[in-house]
């Protein structure tokens, strides 16, 4: 009798082990798939998020105090193979725009203040050669635009 109870107990334990193994495997696949889906969904959203209009970039600067992720500096672009005279930014850095470099304000057309620095970013760039639209933002978050390549400036924030 004890021998039969031992065999029955072994069968139950084996069955429970198999059920646990199946359950753990299913849970692992479920969480793995969910994580991959969330990661790829976030990646696609981030890659698709190109902000390059005057209002879009100005709003982003005011909110986050940095340029959107689709901006790279001239040196970062050059490291990827960008040559300004070739107009090849879209080829070497798809979806990216030039921005974040220092603007010297040599002519003094933008408001000056001790310790204030200005940076610039391309606006409305899609491909080919860069256009004349730029946004200028200061270290104390003044924001100006130019549509005539630094000839005139308009405060937008």
UniProtKB/Swiss-Prot annotation:
GO terms for cellular component: extracellular region
Keyword Hydrolase: yes
Principal location class: secreted
InterPro entries the UniProt entry points to: Barnase, N1-like, Ribonuclease/ribotoxin, RNase_N1/T1-like_sf
First and last residue of the signal peptide: 1-34
Industrial and biotechnological uses noted in the record: Introduced by genetic manipulation and expressed in male sterile maize and rape by Plant Genetic Systems and in radicchio rosso by Bejo Zaden. Barnase expressed in transgenic plants will specifically destroy the tissue(s) where it is expressed. After cell transformation, protein expression and plant regeneration, the active nuclease destroys the pollen producing organs thus rendering the plant sterile.
Pfam assignment, any one: Ribonuclease
Disulfide bonds: none
Annotated EC: 3.1.27.-
Proregion residues excised on maturation: 35-47
Active-site residues, as the UniProt record annotates them: 120 (proton acceptor), 149 (proton donor)
Gene3D superfamilies assigned: 3.40.20.20
GO MF terms, alphabetically ordered: RNA binding; RNA endonuclease activity
UniProt subcellular location: Secreted
The entry's keywords: Endonuclease, Genetically modified food, Hydrolase, Nuclease, Secreted, Signal
Purpose: Hydrolyzes phosphodiester bonds in RNA, poly- and oligoribonucleotides resulting in 3'-nucleoside monophosphates via 2',3'-cyclophosphate intermediates.
Family the entry assigns: Belongs to the ribonuclease N1/T1 family.
Protein name: Ribonuclease
Organism: Bacillus amyloliquefaciens (Bacillus velezensis)
Lineage of the organism: Bacteria, Bacillati, Bacillota, Bacilli, Bacillales
């Amino acid at each position: 009798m004890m021998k039969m109870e031992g065999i029955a107990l072994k069968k139950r334990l084996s069955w429970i082990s198999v059920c646990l193994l199946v359950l753990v495997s299913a849970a692992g696949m479920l969480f793995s798939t969910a994580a991959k889906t969330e990661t790829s969904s976030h990646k696609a959203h981030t890659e698709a998020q190109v902000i390059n209009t005057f209002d879009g970039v100005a709003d982003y600067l005011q909110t986050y105090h940095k340029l959107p992720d689709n901006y790279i500096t001239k040196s970062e672009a050059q490291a990827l193979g960008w040559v300004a005279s070739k107009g090849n930014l879209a080829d070497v850095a798809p979806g990216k725009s030039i921005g974040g470099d220092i603007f010297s304000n040599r002519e003094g057309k933008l408001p000056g203040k001790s310790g204030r620095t200005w940076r610039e970013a391309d606006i409305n760039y899609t491909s080919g050669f860069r256009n004349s639209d730029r946004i200028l933002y200061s270290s104390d978050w003044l924001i100006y635009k130019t549509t005539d390549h630094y000839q005139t400036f308009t405060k937008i924030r």
